[in-house]
Regions:
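Glycine-rich phosphate/ribose-binding loops and adjacent secondary-structure elements
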Residues: 59-216
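Alpha/beta catalytic cores of nucleotide-metabolism and tRNA/nucleoside-modifying enzymes
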Residues: 131, 142-155, 165-304
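Alpha-helix initiation/capping motif
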Residues: 1-6, 27, 36-38, 91, ...
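Active-site-facing alpha/beta catalytic cores
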Residues: 1-99
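Residue-level signal for well-ordered alpha-helical segments
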Residues: 18, 36, 45, 49-52, ...
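Short coil/turn segments at secondary-structure junctions
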Residues: 52-59, 127, 219-226
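Short loop/turn motifs at secondary-structure junctions
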Residues: 12-14, 107-108, 177, 247
């Protein structure tokens, strides 16, 4: 914990996320090949240089929801930062236990990142990347509904990830209750990733996912930063334009009644019907809606 405090004090850390699992390979943990453990990486992570670094699929500091929340509160007290969790979704017992333990308001996570099974990596067995963990929409909805039913959804910041860098997917995520979305592969594609699936070999041909200095020379920071920025600006523009089309100032104000899911060419159902939401779920509190509208107005967005 002393090392964690030192890192937090030495860098602009905004929050701490405890990774429980990853949508692309839930239940597998991780392995950083020794070829990618450079002197810099070894120093940062406190591991031997050039040696495979295996991260287990389970944490040693806790073994259930109760002990996890004790650990979350301990880290929050020691660092003064928001502490949350990231997880793929499968068996719902964990989430039921989490809600039950948070209802009292005594302990809880500050944010939850739901990572859909669509989450990407170039270093996972195909069976896991294709067929393990719920897709984002199903997994997120199942988690959010449990918090909404318990009346504590406003106490948690919900974050979505898993192919949400595409504007149509992001809009659905916001409507389902996500307060923000994480973007990974789309940013990587914007700076040159060709999905060669060599991330774990340290031989990424475009230099995007490698610690090999010779290969990394292929990345021009000036050019690539402009391309990444253009992607982010375009995504933001599209999200705001769709929001305007729905009559609201911000994508976070789009509701599950605003969106329909088409079933073939002959029928449709609202997002609320498809995911069994009650009216009013998925949107910020009234106070937050007022604050969001005011914030958008100060940045030149007229009220819808």
């Amino acid at each position: 914990i002393d090392r964690l405090r030192a890192v937090v004090q030495s860098a602009p850390v905004k929050a701490i996320e405890i990774k429980l699992s990853q949508g692309a390979k839930p239940g597998l943990g991780g392995m950083l090949p020794g070829a990618k453990v450079t002197p810099e990486i070894a120093e940062i992570r406190g591991i031997p240089q050039g040696v495979d670094c295996k991260s287990p699929s389970r944490h040693t500091e806790f073994h259930d929801v109760d002990s996890m929340l004790d650990w979350v509160e301990f880290i929050a007290d020691e660092t003064g930062l928001p502490v949350g969790i990231k997880s793929a979704v499968g068996n719902m017992d964990f989430w039921d236990d989490l809600v039950a333990n948070m209802i009292s308001g005594q302990r809880g996570v500050d944010f939850i990142t739901v990572d859909g099974g669509e989450g990407g990596t170039g270093a996972a067995p195909l069976i896991f990347s294709e067929s393990v963990a719920y897709p984002f929409r199903i997994g997120f909805a199942e988690v959010y509904k449990r918090f909404a039913e318990a009346g504590i959804s406003d106490l948690v910041t919900f974050i979505g990830s898993g192919k949400l860098g595409l504007p149509d997917n992001a809009i659905v995520a916001f409507a389902l209750g996500a307060d923000m979305v994480n973007v990974g592969r789309e940013i990587m594609l914007s700076i040159g990733c060709i999905q060669s699936q060599k991330c774990h070999t340290d031989s990424c041909p475009t230099g995007v996912a490698t610690q090999n200095a010779w290969l990394a020379r292929g990345l021009d920071p000036t050019l690539k930063s402009e391309r990444a920025a253009n992607y982010i600006k375009t995504l933001r523009r599209d999200l705001l334009k769709v929001s305007e089309a729905c009559g609201v100032e911000h994508p976070g104000l789009i509701t599950t009644d605003d969106l329909d899911i088409l079933e073939g060419v002959g029928s449709k159902s609202s997002l609320r019907e498809v995911y069994d939401y009650e009216k009013g779920w998925g949107v910020p509190s009234m106070a937050d809606q007022v604050a969001i509208t005011a914030l958008m107005a100060t940045h030149g967005h007229e009220p819808a």
